[in-house]
Amino acid sequence: MTTLADLRINIRQTLRTPPPVLNHVLPGLLAGTVGSLIAPGGLGKTTLLTQIGCAIASGNTVLGGALDGTDRSPGKVVLFLAEETLAIMHRKLHEATEQLVSSMASQNKKDQHALLGLLETNLGIYPLGGHGSLVHMGEGTKECRELFELCANARLIVFDPLRQFHDGDENDTAFMTAVVARFQRLARDTGSAVLLAHHANRSSISSGTGEQVGASRGCTALTDGVRWQANLSPVSDALASELGIERADLRDYVRLDCSKANYARPSATVVLRKAPESGLMTLWAPGQSSNRAATAKKRPVATQ
């Protein structure tokens, strides 16, 4: 058992050795720490998280390089999706993989098989729709021990949405502080970055301030406890006008802001365009056409 004395820094040894390079799983989200993704319901959190998971698991760029971490090699990713069913994730996984294939420089069957092999090895997706009770973070429970085993050696672990992984009052500061502490232990023990998806509060939605650090629903314990927070929110009329996005196309765009980063400099707003049918997100930059792109012809992924 670790004692408080064990945690004291050896000053002499520390000052005689260079600091380790920080391992950013996503820009500002370090391995071994907990972060959050805040967004209104229905805006595309799960789709975005699936895309991020597929990219990291296969060693591809994340959203055109906008969210690339320090280590670009393929890494293990685990997604616990409490509100999604197998049928929905079957579709989302197909769509995300087709997007990866379309972005590959070479799209021959050999490269597609290599991609599938990486996803099969590194990507663990658990659609828990209707089975949310299978995952509880209670200390010493069978579910907790199994969860730790599933997450061993992962680079990124996602819980979507956080509300489905505890049964307490999210307005209770003491309770939510304890919830965050459980996820911090998971991050510490596995060395993984843990990302908690959570809903935005009504005030931020109605006032159009979903990009702000205070947009998280419930008490401030979640925002205070995590080391990194990203916000997914609609593009406002003002931002659309500034960027040259036509108002008629606003529903096809979202903004991603890093509202809190303890270990990185503030980053610029990232604007993402959503595909009309699948909702898949791609990096958008001023100067690109704001009209809805024609749905790209799907490229089937080789399976044999």
Question: Predicted segments — roles?
Answer:
Residues 1-99:
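The Walker A/P-loop phosphate-binding site
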Residues 2-5, 71-170:
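Conserved inter-motif catalytic segment of the P-loop NTP-binding fold
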Residues 16-21, 138, 210-213:
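Short gly/ser/thr-rich secondary-structure transition/capping motifs
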Residues 29, 69-73, 117, 149-151, ...:
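Conserved catalytic network of the ASCE P-loop NTPase/AAA+ motor domain
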Residues 36-38, 42, 47, 80, ...:
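Phosphate-binding/switch region of NTP-binding enzymes
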Residues 52, 88-96, 143-146, 178-182, ...:
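Alpha-helical scaffold elements adjacent to nucleotide-binding pockets in ATP/GTP-utilizing enzyme cores
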Residues 62-72, 108-110, 205-206, 240:
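Short helix/loop segment immediately N-terminal to the Walker
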Residues 261-304:
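Conserved alpha/beta core segments of nucleic-acid transaction machinery
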